[in-house]
C-alpha cells in the first residue's frame, strides 16, 4: 500500500485548511538528454504523472486558485504548470497528461512562437554543436571552457547561462550572438510551439497563460517596458484564442531577484486573476494570488517524490503558522 495519499491528506486537508501544490515543468524530452538532465524524458514524465494522480486531486489552475480563496479546495489539491511554450509540451507532454486524465496550464512566451528560439536554448545548442573540445570565450568575458566530456560540457553550459542570465536584455542578446559566432553554429527553429499548436492545446482542454513576449527578467526593465512585455503577451494570446487570459507566470520567477513588488502590482492592474513564481512552497489562504509558489519534482523514485512533497508541506505549514502567530 502506498502511504503518501493518506500522509498528504494530513498536511493538505481541504476546505478551511486547504493548501495548493503547484508543479512546475519546462520541457518533456522524447528521450534522456545528458546536457539538459533537469528536464524529464517521456518515460520519466509518464511515471511522475502516475504518482501525481495517485497522491493528489489535480485541478485546473484557475479553478484551484478560486477555490483556495473560497476555502473550498479538496484535500491534496494540486495543479500542473509548464513555462515557456516548448513544442514538446504539445507533442509529448499533452498526450501523456491526457492518458492520465490530467490537465495543465501552459505559460507562453509569445515572442518565440513559430520558429523562435529562447536565448538559453541558443546557448545550449551552440555548446552542444561546438566542434572544438576547448571553447575560448575570453574575448567576450566568459572564460575558457573544457568541452571534452559530457560532465564538462554540462558544467560549461551552466556557468555560461548563469553569467549572462541577469544582464540587460540587449547585453544578453549580444553575448548570445557572440557565442553563436565564435562556435560557428545556428539556432534551432523547431523548439517552440506554433500558434496553431497553442490553439490546439487549448481546444484539447489545457489552459493557456501569459509569460511575457521575450522572457526578460522584469526586475531589469524600466516599469513601462516591463508592463508592455506582460500586456503585449496577454493581448497576443487573447487575440489568438479569442478568450480572456487570466493567468501569468513571472520569467525566471524569483521574488526580488527576478521581479519587484511594482511588477506584482502591474500584474494585478492588468487584470490577471493569479500569477505564479518559482519560489518553492505551498499556497494557502494567506498567499497572495499574484505570487503563488511552485515546486519542480525532480525525484526519480515514488518514495522520494512523496517524502519531499510531504516535507515541503510540513515546512510551509510551520512557516505560515509562525506568520499567523506573529500578527
Regions picked out by a protein language model, each given a short descriptive name:
Residues 103-107, 209, 273-276:
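Structural detector of well-ordered beta-strand residues that form the stable sheet scaffold
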Residues 15-17, 116-204:
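Extended, charge-rich helix/loop segments that form flexible
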Residues 1-81, 88, 119-139, 220-327:
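C-terminal active-site subregion of NodB/CE4 polysaccharide deacetylases
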Residues 15, 53, 96-100, 193-210, ...:
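Acidic (Asp/Glu)-rich catalytic clusters
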Residues 92-110:
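A short alpha/beta connector and helix-capping loop motif
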Residues 110-114, 280-281:
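Short beta-alpha junction loops
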Residues 182-185, 189-207, 214-241:
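Alpha-helical scaffold elements lining the catalytic groove of polysaccharide deacetylases
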Amino acid at each position: 500500500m502506498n502511504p503518501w495519499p493518506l500522509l498528504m491528506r494530513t498536511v493538505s486537508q481541504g476546505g478551511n485548511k486547504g493548501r495548493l501544490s503547484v508543479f512546475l515543468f519546462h520541457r518533456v524530452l522524447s528521450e534522456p538528454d545528458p546536457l539538459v538532465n533537469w528536464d524529464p524524458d517521456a518515460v520519466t514524465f509518464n511515471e511522475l504523472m502516475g504518482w501525481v494522480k495517485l497522491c493528489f486531486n489535480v485541478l485546473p489552475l484557475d479553478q484551484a486558485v478560486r477555490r483556495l480563496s473560497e476555502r473550498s479546495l479538496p484535500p491534496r489539491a494540486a495543479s500542473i504548470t509548464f513555462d515557456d511554450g516548448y513544442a514538446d509540451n504539445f507533442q509529448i507532454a499533452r498526450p501523456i497528461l491526457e492518458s492520465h486524465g490530467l490537465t495543465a496550464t501552459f505559460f507562453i512566451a509569445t515572442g518565440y512562437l513559430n520558429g523562435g528560439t529562447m536565448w538559453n536554448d541558443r546557448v545550449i545548442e551552440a555548446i552542444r554543436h561546438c566542434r572544438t573540445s576547448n571553447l575560448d570565450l575570453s574575448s567576450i568575458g566568459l572564460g575558457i571552457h573544457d568541452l571534452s566530456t559530457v560532465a564538462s560540457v554540462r558544467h560549461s553550459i551552466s556557468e555560461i547561462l548563469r553569467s549572462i542570465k541577469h544582464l540587460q536584455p540587449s547585453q544578453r542578446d549580444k553575448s548570445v550572438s557572440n557565442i553563436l559566432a565564435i562556435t560557428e553554429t545556428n539556432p534551432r527553429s523547431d523548439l517552440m510551439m506554433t500558434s496553431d499548436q497553442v490553439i490546439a492545446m487549448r481546444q484539447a482542454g489545457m489552459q493557456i497563460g501569459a509569460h511575457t513576449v521575450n522572457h526578460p527578467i522584469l526586475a531589469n526593465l524600466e516599469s513601462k517596458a516591463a508592463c508592455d512585455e506582460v500586456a503585449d503577451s496577454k493581448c497576443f494570446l487573447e487575440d489568438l484564442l479569442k478568450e480572456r487570459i487570466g493567468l501569468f507566470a513571472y520569467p525566471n520567477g524569483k521574488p526580488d531577484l527576478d521581479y519587484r513588488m511594482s511588477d506584482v502590482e502591474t500584474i494585478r492592474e492588468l487584470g490577471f486573476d493569479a500569477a505564479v513564481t518559482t519560489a518553492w512552497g505551498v499556497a494557502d489562504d494567506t498567499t497572495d494570488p499574484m505570487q503563488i509558489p511552485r515546486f519542480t519534482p525532480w525525484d526519480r523514485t515514488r518514495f522520494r517524490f512523496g517524502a519531499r512533497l510531504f516535507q515541503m508541506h510540513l515546512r510551509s505549514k510551520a512557516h505560515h503558522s509562525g506568520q499567523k502567530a506573529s500578527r
